[in-house]
């Protein structure tokens, strides 16, 4: 959204006198390093919501990340680092008092932790996600009570006895995944993919094997996920060719320390993973009884899906949106997406369709306006747009970042549009959540605060303000004892500021 001009009077005199730009606790007392930009509105919401903050050990860093799922049956079938843990979802379900027959929503489904945890407890769920990696992560897990163990044993035996042969099919790489596998590994991967597609096993078993093939891609490749990028083994053609060009140009070769050692074969990884998953399925089928809960996966973005859902549908929402941290899931999971048939054009479309969290995202306002018009919801769109343009806190943040950009402190102008787009789109999502939640429904959002160019963005409190403006009642903001750090570049220039990792809890009256 266009921002309004802000007063350069940074804060009232009594506030100025008491500012501390470094504080050991979770309260933020200085949002703009060296008071460079206005921070009155951010200080106001800090004061308004600080009394509902509860520092907690019940929800720790392990629970609000994938770490606690690493040893959890089902949830560890595919590594999805951006997710949260099943234990977190169980704790929130208990706190919200949900029971069998209730319906829970996760508008950013990821690897499906919310829906799968609900399934085990007999609670209905709807999950929304646009990324194909999310779809393949969730669907095979949702079949947990449907698998035929004898059939899985037969599939295991057949794979064990197979010797892969040369296949003419080629892996449809993206430019950033080219050369990810040794030649023989790539051939074997395609061989087993073709075998799975053409086998006579049930849909459930075939989909499970597809999940396993996706889950082992990193393990059998020259790549390793590192933040939002792929790191490359020194033996990969990408590193070899890059260094060759650098030497021809008289430059030093890239110094890479990644050495993954001997890579397992596709067959080894497939068999080992299938064996582990078979044991998980056997144990869960023995310990747990199937229930009649219903679970729906909507393969779309939350921005598109939510406006079409009926009023008063959900008893709770538990989710974690992509963070406003420039991480691009289409790059992090490029290898998996390429394997699933996503080409360069589709990658760009997926990147733009996701919640704006990368510097490449463009404004979705015209697209959203046209979409709401197509659904005959023009008045709803206009109401949401008014909430965005009237958001004084977001206007202040936009102004502060623009001033930092003009001062040469923002290293990518796309950060400005990303931050504005992020909260603009969350306003649409929060509005639709309020409409689709039943009275009394509680909403939990897991998110991190961020800082760009010395400007702190209180994601937790700003999200809570937006939610309250829409009609939600703020209940509590859990903050973790473990704070989030800053990039080395920011610490070097602006000092270290501990940022909150929070779980915001709201209720529809």
From Swiss-Prot:
InterPro entries: DNA_methylase_N4/N6, MeTrfase_CN4_CS, SAM-dependent_MTases_sf. It holds the Pfam family N6_N4_Mtase. Keywords: DNA-binding, Methyltransferase, Restriction system, S-adenosyl-L-methionine, Transferase. The keyword Transferase applies. It is an enzyme of class 2 (transferase). It comes from the Bacteria. It catalyses: a 2'-deoxycytidine in DNA + S-adenosyl-L-methionine = an N(4)-methyl-2'-deoxycytidine in DNA + S-adenosyl-L-homocysteine + H(+). This is Type II methyltransferase M.BsoBI.
